[in-house]
Structure formats: structure tokens, C-alpha cells
Amino acid sequence: MAVKIKLTRLGKIRNPQYRIVVADSRTRRNGRAIETIGKYHPKEEPSLIEVDSERAQYWLGVGAQPTEPVEAILKITGDWQKFKGLPGAEGTLRVKEAKPSKLELFQAALAQAENEPVGEAITPKKKKAKAEDAEAAADAPAEAAAESEAADK
């Protein structure tokens, strides 16, 4: 029985996700698999590649032939070089940077807020500004009348 290591497609229309499976070479693309040995999500940045290295080495050792896309994935993870005995068995797989936890972000924001000086609001509220303008307008005619009376005397 000819065995291949190939990709089966999962996911939505524009978001493909693949499983790396070992299957009979005559089965359909998404047909029955003998074993699932990994997954590949090409749309993530960097692409998510997980391969069970031990099982991949076993299947390559017993004669399973990888398809071209799977061979490229195995080269990235370093499993192909390990199987062939070539240098560079560590692979070129890029790992996504770990996101800081929400608790750490909150603690940093809290520490930054404590260090800032506490003061009045920079801009006054609009209601106060309107009230002050109304008072100033009411005082202006009274002051003008008082000044004109002082000038007359």
C-alpha cells in the first residue's frame, strides 16, 4: 500500500487551515486518514506549523512519501533534514511573539497613572463656561452704568 503524507483542508472559504495527515495515496484530498501528525494555518502571521516530529520520522522511515507542500513544511520544521541526515536539522520555523497578559497591561497602566500629577481638568465644563459668560454679560451693563454715573459727577 502506497502511503503519502499530505494536507487535508479545513476552515472557511478565505481562511484555509490544514491538517498534516498520513493517508493512502489513492484516497481523496479530505478522505479517510491513517493518522494526523500535525497542523498548518497559513493565514496567521507567522504561519502556525505544528508537526509531531517523532511520528513524522516514523512514517518517513517506513516509506511514506510527502507531497511537495508537506515536504516544504517538513524542511521548515527541520524534520526533513533530520530524516535525510543533512545539516540544518534545527529548521527555520519562526515563533510568534508572546502577547503580554491583560493583568500585566493593567498593572503597567495603573503604575503609570499613579506617577502622573493629579490636577484640575484642563478645560472647564461647558455649562460653567456659559454660566460665567451670562454673569459677565449681566455685570457689564451694571458696571458701564456705574462708570457713566461716576463720570457725570
UniProtKB/Swiss-Prot annotation:
The keyword Ribonucleoprotein applies. One of its GO terms (molecular function) is structural constituent of ribosome. GO terms for biological process: translation. GO terms for cellular component: cytoplasm; small ribosomal subunit. PROSITE patterns: RIBOSOMAL_S16. Keywords: Ribonucleoprotein, Ribosomal protein. Residues 137-153 have a biased composition (Low complexity). Residues 114-153 are annotated as: Disordered. It holds the Pfam family Ribosomal_S16. Belongs to the bacterial ribosomal protein bS16 family. This is Small ribosomal subunit protein bS16. It comes from Rhodococcus jostii (strain RHA1). The gene is rpsP.
